[in-house]
Curated annotation (Swiss-Prot):
InterPro entries: Hist_DNA-bd, Histone-like_DNA-bd_CS, IHF-like_DNA-bd_dom_sf, IHF_beta. Belongs to the bacterial histone-like protein family. PANTHER family: DNA-BINDING PROTEIN HU, INTEGRATION HOST FACTOR SUBUNIT BETA. HAMAP family: IHF_beta. The keyword Transcription applies. GO terms for cellular component: chromosome; cytosol. Heterodimer of an alpha and a beta chain. This protein is one of the two subunits of integration host factor, a specific DNA-binding protein that functions in genetic recombination as well as in transcriptional and translational control. This is Integration host factor subunit beta. One of its GO terms (molecular function) is DNA binding.
Length: 93
């Protein structure tokens, strides 16, 4: 599902809301989540899951084309951990 699909589905299920309002709400939610992670904080949505940052230490990688060794810098990457309710819903398929 893409962001456009999400907006379309929400607009059709919440017909009392204008599509532009739904789009603005989705955009604002995603921006708020990105800003929260950017500031180093964790996001927890009970029953759904949590978003956090995981630290990746610097390491020596390899260029797949040339085989040349490349120094990779340390970085933080976003991580999603599904909640119990979401895991149970997905596993019941």
């Amino acid at each position: 599902m893409t962001k456009s699909d999400l907006i379309e589905r929400l607009s059709s299920s919440q017909q009392h809301l204008a599509a532009k309002d739904v789009e603005a709400a989705v955009r604002e939610i995603l921006e708020c989540m990105a800003a929260t992670l950017e500031s180093g904080n964790r996001i927890e949505i009970r029953g759904f899951g949590s978003f956090s940052l995981h630290y990746r230490a610097p390491r020596v990688g390899r260029n797949p084309k040339t085989g040349e060794k490349v120094e990779l810098l340390a970085k933080s990457v976003p991580h999603f951990k599904p909640g119990k309710e979401l895991r149970e819903r997905v596993n019941s398929l």
